[in-house]
């Protein structure tokens, strides 16, 4: 096959699932993206893909060229950016491609902003067949895919092995801990008992810490207690009273046994990080992007040093035999319902290929989106932590693609605060939270029991 025919075949095969494009000599696509130092190549890879496509057009003897108009916003977070994007769409300024947090996909679909990519994905296995399958869940809405994951992460429990050693636990215990968690043999209650034991023996000053404010991290702990917070068929949030009671009861148990500070929700982020990185706390649950700061804080030089010092585990199961969980929060590309959605989908596919995505992932401490990336030299050399984290995606939960998940998280967090500080019993906190969910979310939430 000639270079010309190959380029043409790639272009038309990748776009065949959408309407055939009508090209002018120069086509301008609008790309919406936050100015985000934590992920500059999310937008940059689209620009690079357009440059590559232009080289293909030139090689094929075509005068067609693609230009990218970057609509770069200064919104402080992905939620604010999503609201601004919806506002732009409402006044007819829908971008052809947007970088967004996956949980907003439902809102984008309902607003008529996001194009359905099912047929595009199915028709393009050379781009997508190696995608880590769990990641597709993050772009689903009512059973269909409306985005392409661009990065992922793992939020899990970090464990300080030296504190375990100082408390009298041998290397065999440390080595077997991840496997015991994975098999459901080490529970959430076992975790708090272990952390409390290290405090009682003087090996740790604090048992473990969690984030000090509202956020998605708590979802993995809730999932460990059987709380499935989304009903995909009805596209609604949901909560189970029995599961929430068990979850809040576990938090009370951890405070009462001395493993979790009662004032945890009054900590600052600096004091939370310092508790673990300073060697005071046995554990912390947060995200894989902490590895760099942990390496520096503990004076570590590579993967061998790191995993001798620290162990990663899922959020353990609530009961023996249950399933452990963790959390991932992908950022995604969506394709707008615009005149050039077919061309936009092709650029998204090109930007999602292993070479550009690896440059983004390794440079920003994100796990890969395809299995093949972990064998690439750049990942092997610089991304050893990301390679180690990739298998954990098999247990990953994702935030629901629902516009009110932020409110849901904020309300359930008030129960965390109330229980940990002792202001309410778990049962009282559950009643308060369920009442607030019904008032604030109305028909958007299902109370299961």
Language model: regions and residue ranges:
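Hinge/lid segment of periplasmic solute-binding proteins
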Residues: 100-156, 165, 189, 307-316, ...
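Conserved N-terminal structural module of periplasmic/extracytoplasmic solute-binding proteins
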Residues: 21-107, 122-125, 167, 171-172, ...
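Extracytoplasmic/periplasmic solute-binding protein
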Residues: 142-151, 155, 182-237
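Short helix-initiation/N-cap motifs at beta->coil->alpha
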Residues: 71-84, 103, 182-190, 263-277
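Short, solvent-exposed loop/beta-turn-alpha elements that line the ligand-binding surface or hinge
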Residues: 118-131, 173-184, 227-246, 296-305, ...
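Long, aromatic- and glycine/proline-rich binding clefts that accommodate carbohydrate-like moieties
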Residues: 307-317, 361-418, 443-449
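Glycine-centered hinge/linker elements that transmit conformational signals in sensory
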Residues: 190-198, 233-268, 315
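Extracytoplasmic/periplasmic substrate-recognition and gating elements
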Residues: 25, 60-62, 167, 256-259, ...
């Amino acid at each position: 096959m000639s270079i010309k025919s190959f380029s043409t075949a790639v272009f038309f095969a990748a776009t065949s699932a959408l309407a055939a494009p009508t090209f002018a000599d120069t086509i301008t696509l609008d790309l919406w993206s936050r100015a985000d130092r934590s992920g500059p190549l999310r937008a940059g890879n689209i620009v690079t893909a357009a440059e590559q496509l232009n080289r293909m057009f030139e090689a094929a003897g075509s005068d067609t060229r693609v230009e990218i108009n970057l609509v770069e916003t200064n919104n402080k977070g992905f939620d604010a950016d999503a609201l601004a994007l919806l506002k732009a769409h409402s006044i007819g300024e829908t971008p052809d491609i947007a970088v967004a947090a996956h949980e907003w996909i439902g809102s984008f679909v309902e607003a008529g902003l996001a194009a359905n990519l099912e047929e595009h994905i199915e028709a393009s296995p050379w781009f997508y067949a190696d995608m880590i399958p769990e990641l597709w869940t993050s772009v689903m809405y009512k059973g269909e895919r409306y985005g392409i994951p661009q990065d992922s992460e793992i939020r899990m429990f970090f464990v300080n092995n030296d504190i375990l050693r100082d408390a009298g636990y041998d290397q065999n215990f440390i080595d077997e801990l991840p496997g015991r968690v994975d098999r459901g043999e080490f529970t959430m209650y076992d975790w708090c008992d272990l952390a409390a034991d290290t405090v009682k023996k003087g090996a740790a000053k604090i048992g473990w810490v969690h984030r000090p404010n509202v956020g998605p991290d708590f979802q993995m702990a809730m999932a460990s207690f059987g709380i499935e917070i989304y009903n995909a068929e009805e596209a609604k949030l949901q909560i189970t009273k029995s599961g929430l009671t068990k979850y809040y009861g576990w938090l009370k148990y951890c405070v009462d046994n001395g493993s979790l500070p009662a004032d945890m929700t009054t900590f600052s982020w600096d004091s939370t990080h310092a508790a673990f990185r300073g060697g005071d706390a046995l554990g912390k649950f947060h995200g894989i992007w902490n590895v760099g700061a942990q390496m520096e804080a503990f004076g570590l030089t590579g993967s061998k040093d790191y995993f001798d010092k620290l162990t990663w585990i899922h959020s353990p199961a609530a009961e023996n035999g249950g399933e452990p969980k963790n959390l991932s929060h992908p950022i995604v590309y969506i394709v707008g319902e615009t005149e050039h959605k077919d061309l936009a989908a092709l650029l998204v596919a090109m930007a999602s290929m292993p070479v550009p995505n690896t440059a983004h992932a390794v440079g920003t401490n994100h796990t890969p989106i395809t299995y093949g990336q972990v064998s690439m030299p750049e990942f092997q050399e610089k991304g050893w932590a990301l390679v180690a984290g990739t298998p954990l995606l098999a247990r990953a939960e994702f935030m629901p693609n629902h516009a009110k998940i932020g409110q849901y998280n904020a309300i359930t967090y008030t129960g965390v605060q109330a229980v940990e500080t002792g202001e309410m019993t778990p049962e009282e906190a559950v009643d308060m939270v369920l009442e607030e969910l019904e008032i604030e979310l109305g028909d958007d939430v299902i109370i299961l029991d």
